[in-house]
Curated annotation (Swiss-Prot):
Its EC number is 6.3.4.4. SUPFAM superfamilies: P-loop containing nucleoside triphosphate hydrolases. This is Adenylosuccinate synthetase. It comes from Eremothecium gossypii (strain ATCC 10895 / CBS 109.51 / FGSC 9923 / NRRL Y-1056) (Yeast). Plays an important role in the de novo pathway and in the salvage pathway of purine nucleotide biosynthesis. Catalyzes the first committed step in the biosynthesis of AMP from IMP.
Length: 433
C-alpha cells in the first residue's frame, strides 16, 4: 500500500501535520522531490521539531524513512538537521533513515550561483521582480542534473578504488562551468572537497538503492506514506512558471522520484489551507492587500519555516484547487487552519476567473493572463466561534460545516480531515465513503 500526501496550493498548507497524524499507521515514510528549500514544524509532547529535508516520519520510533532519488541533498545540511533533531531527543534516527544512491548532491557553489542567478533574473525583468528562490541551491542542482553534469550520492560513497579521483575531477569541472557562466566568484574548492571526503564514511551507512528498497517494501506489503514537498502550484510544469521550484511536486514527481509505477498508488491526500498563501513573487489572483489579508497573516502567523519570509495572504481559490485536483487525482482532502477564519463575519471564496468579461475554462498557463484576471467570489457566512477546542467534526458550527461542504461540492472530492489548531491533537476526522 502506497498513500501520498501532496500540497494543493503554493506550499505551507500543513502537510507535515497530516503526515504526523498518519505516520503511526505506516512502516515507511518517503520523500520524493525537493531539498531543504521547504519546511514544516511538528509538535510532539510539547517539543517543536523543524523539518526541511528529512522525512517527518522520524518522529515515529517504529518508522523507516527514505529520501528518494528525486530529492537533492546538501550533505552538511542533512547532518545539521539530523543533529538538531537528535539534540531535541529524537532517538535512533540514524538507524531508520536512508538516502537513495541516485539522489543528486547540492554543493556550496550551487547555493552561491542560486543567488547570482536570482540577481541576474531580477535585473533583466521589466518589473525587477525575483523568482523568489530560497537560495538553497536547489534550482542550480536540478539544472546540472538535467544537463547530465551533476554528481550523485553514489559518486561520493563508492568504494571503487578510482571513485574519489573521479569525484574530484567531476566536481572541479562542474565548478569551472559555473564560474565560466557567472564569472569568477569566491569559493574555497579545496575546503569543500576536504569536507566531502570526510563525509564519505559518515554518509555511507545511510545509502541504499532506493528502487530495491521501495519494491522490496511493496512486495512485502509494507504500508508506505509518501510525503510531498512544496505543492502543485510550485511544480516546474504545472505551477505558475517561472515562479516555481525546479522539481515535479505533483503525483508525477512521486513516481519518478521514488521509481514506482502508478498502479502501486492507492490514496492521494490533498492538503488545502482554508485560505490561500504564497511566499515570493508571482501572480496571486485572490490575494488581499487590505485588512482581510493583514488579519489572515496575523492570526495565521504566516511566516515561512525555511526563510522566515512573510507570506502573502488571500481568500481560498477554488480554481486553483480544482486544477490541482485534476492533475493529482486527490481521493480526499485535508482542510487546514480552519480556525484562522473563526472571527470573520463573512468569508469569500474564489470560484472562477474571467478576462475582459469572458470566463476562463480553467487555471491559465499564461501569467500575462493570470495577472489580469477578475475573480468571481461567493460570500459565505462566518461562524464567529472558537473552534480550537472542538474534538469531533459533528460538533463544528453549522456555518463551518457549510464552508467545508461548499469546497467538497465544488471540487468533487470529500473532506476527510479538518485542522482546527496548531497541535497534533487539533485535527478532526470525518468518515468518507
Amino acid at each position: 500500500m502506497v498513500n501520498v500526501v501532496l500540497g494543493s496550493q503554493w506550499g505551507d498548507e500543513g502537510k507535515g501535520k497530516l503526515v504526523d497524524l498518519l505516520v503511526s499507521k505506516y512502516d515507511i515514510v518517503a520523500r520524493s522531490a525537493g531539498g531543504n528549500n521547504a519546511g514544516h514544524t511538528i509538535v510532539v509532547g510539547g517539543i517543536k521539531y523543524d523539518f526541511h529535508m528529512l522525512p517527518s516520519g522520524l518522529v515515529n520510533p517504529n518508522c523507516q524513512n527514505l529520501i528518494g532519488n528525486g530529492v537533492v541533498i546538501h550533505v552538511p545540511s542533512f547532518f545539521g538537521e539530523l543533529e538538531q533533531l537528535e539534540a531535541k531527543g529524537l532517538r535512533d534516527a540514524r538507524g531508520r533513515l536512508f538516502i537513495s544512491s541516485r539522489a543528486h548532491l547540492v554543493f556550496d557553489f550551487h547555493q552561491r550561483t542560486d543567488k547570482l542567478r536570482e540577481l541576474e533574473l531580477s535585473g533583466k525583468s521589466k518589473d525587477g521582480k525575483n523568482i523568489g528562490t530560497t537560495g538553497k541551491g536547489i534550482g542550480p542542482t536540478y539544472s546540472t542534473k538535467a544537463s547530465r553534469s551533476g554528481l550523485r550520492v553514489h559518486h561520493l560513497v563508492s568504494e571503487q578504488p578510482e571513485a574519489w579521483a573521479e569525484f574530484e575531477t567531476k566536481y572541479r569541472r562542474l565548478l569551472e562551468t559555473r564560474q565560466q557562466r557567472y564569472g569568477p566568484f569566491e569559493h574555497d574548492a579545496e575546503e569543500e572537497l576536504a569536507r566531502y571526503r570526510r563525509y564519505r564514511e559518515e554518509l555511507r551507512p545511510f545509502v541504499v538503492d532506493s528502487v530495491v528498497f521501495m519494491h522490496n517494501a511493496i512486495q512485502q506489503k509494507k504500508k508506505i506514506l509518501v510525503e510531498g514537498a512544496n505543492a502543485l502550484m510550485l511544480d516546474i510544469d504545472f505551477g505558475t512558471y517561472p515562479y516555481v521550484t525546479s522539481s515535479s511536486t505533483g503525483i508525477g514527481g512521486v513516481l519518478t522520484g521514488l521509481g514506482i509505477p502508478p498502479r502501486c498508488i492507492d490514496e492521494i491526500y490533498g492538503v488545502v489551507k482554508a485560505y490561500t498563501t504564497r511566499v515570493g513573487e508571482g501572480p496571486f489572483p485572490t490575494e488581499q492587500l487590505n485588512e482581510a489579508g493583514d488579519k489572515l497573516q496575523t492570526i495565521g502567523a504566516e511566516y515561512g519555516v525555511t526563510t522566515g519570509r512573510k507570506r502573502r495572504c488571500g481568500w481560498l481559490d477554488l480554481v486553483v484547487l480544482k486544477y490541482s485536483t485534476l492533475i493529482n487525482g486527490f481521493t480526499s482532502l485535508n482542510i487546514t487552519k480552519l480556525d484562522v477564519l473563526d472571527t470573520f463575519k463573512e468569508i469569500k471564496v474564489g470560484i472562477s476567473y474571467s478576462l475582459n468579461g469572458k470566463k476562463l475554462d480553467l487555471f491559465p498557463e499564461d501569467l500575462l493572463v493570470l495577472s489580469k484576471v477578475d475573480v468571481e467570489y461567493v460570500t459565505l457566512p462566518g461562524w464567529d466561534e472558537d473552534i480550537t477546542k472542538i474534538s469531533r467534526y459533528e460538533d463544528l458550527p453549522e456555518n463551518a460545516k457549510s464552508y467545508l461542504k461548499f469546497i467538497e461540492d465544488f471540487v468533487g472530492v470529500p473532506v476527510e480531515w479538518v485542522g482546527t489548531g496548531p497541535g497534533r491533537e487539533s485535527m478532526l476526522h470525518k468518515e468518507v465513503s
